[in-house]
């Protein structure tokens, strides 16, 4: 049984939440988000708190209701604070620049990689070797960061590539003569 799911999600002031069937809608100062909860999970809004319970006593329902509670908590946090991911670029000649709605990455290929920024995501480049991704939906922010990182993941010998801030890269030793 999930311990995460037992705790209700408190809806802070300035945020409105509504539950219609299996859809949870949350509206706050930064925007509006919605999430469709799985059919094996019951969702209720009572006294400014969203509670999540398994509908059946099956292993699947018990596994899903902790996930559903975490998703609803992410909706509330997203519309109040938002989410941010930071990426670092390491390597000679590796850099990032913003061009309108596109992020242009020079990652050692014969061509520059152009990434189109999706709706609801704001990307800033404070330095040519740093990328900040900000948005209200944690899944979209994480997906954008993972897609940008996948263009040139860090390699274990020199550590060159795109990595998350404070990510540990397991380094290997080169060949011995």
UniProtKB/Swiss-Prot annotation:
Part of the 50S ribosomal subunit. The keyword Ribosomal protein applies. It comes from Rhodopseudomonas palustris (strain BisA53). GO terms for molecular function: rRNA binding; structural constituent of ribosome. One of its GO terms (cellular component) is cytosolic large ribosomal subunit. GO terms for biological process: cytoplasmic translation. The keyword Ribosomal protein applies. This protein binds to the 23S rRNA, and is important in its secondary structure. It is located near the subunit interface in the base of the L7/L12 stalk, and near the tRNA binding site of the peptidyltransferase center. Pfam families: Ribosomal_L6. Keywords: Ribonucleoprotein, Ribosomal protein, RNA-binding, rRNA-binding. This is Large ribosomal subunit protein uL6. Belongs to the universal ribosomal protein uL6 family.
């Amino acid at each position: 049984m999930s311990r995460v799911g037992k705790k209700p999600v408190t809806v802070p002031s300035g945020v409105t939440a509504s539950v219609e069937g299996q859809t949870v809608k949350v509206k706050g100062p930064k925007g509006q988000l919605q999430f469709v909860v799985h059919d094996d999970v019951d969702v209720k809004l009572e006294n400014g708190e969203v509670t999540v319970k398994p509908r059946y006593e099956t292993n699947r329902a018990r596994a899903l209701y902790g996930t559903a509670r975490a998703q609803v908590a992410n909706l509330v946090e997203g519309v109040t604070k938002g989410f941010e991911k930071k990426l670092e670029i390491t390597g000679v000649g590796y850099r990032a620049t913003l061009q309108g709605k596109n992020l242009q990455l020079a990652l050692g290929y014969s061509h520059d990689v152009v990434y189109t920024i999706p709706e609801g995501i704001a990307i800033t480049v404070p330095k040519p070797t740093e990328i900040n991704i900000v948005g209200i939906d944690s899944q979209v922010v994480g997906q954008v960061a993972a897609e940008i990182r996948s263009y040139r993941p860090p390699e274990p010998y020199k550590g060159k590539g795109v990595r998350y801030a404070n990510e540990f890269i397991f380094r290997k030793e080169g060949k011995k003569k």
